[in-house]
Amino acid sequence: MSSQPFPALPLDPKLQRVERYWRSLIRGANDTPFWDDFAPSALADMEEDVMLVDVFDKPLRLRFNTIVGAAIEARYGTAVRDRFSDEIEPSSPFEYFNAQASATIEARAPTVHQAAGYRRLLLPMWGDGRVSMMLGAFAWL
C-alpha cells in the first residue's frame, strides 16, 4: 500500500471498525476495495457518523453522496447531501476536507484528520479505473 500522507493516529474503536470493514472488501492483490462492494447495511449501527463522497476527475470535484450521517450534518449545521465540497463553507467538521480528500485520492490510501472535537477517516474506493468514491467516518471527541 502507498505511504500515508497524514501521520497515523491511534484510531477510535468506531473508526477502527470502519477501517476493518473497508479492508475486508479489498479483493486479491488490489490496494483498495471497489465502491460497488460497499454495503451500507454493514455499518447500519454507525449510519449517523458515516458518509460517502463521489469523486469526479478532470477537474477534481467532490460531491457528498446521498449517504451522509445525520450527526455529521447536525455538527455542520445544514444538509450537505448532493452538494459539492467547494460549494460549502470549510467549517467544522469539514475543515481541511478538500486537502485530506486530495491526499486520500492521490495516495489511494486511508487518511485521518483530527481537529478540535472530531477525528475524520477517509477511505478510497475504486471504480472506473480510478478512485471514484470515498467512505468517510467521524469520531466525536
What residues fall within each predicted segment?
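Sensory/regulatory domains in signal-transduction proteins
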Residues: 2-28, 33-141
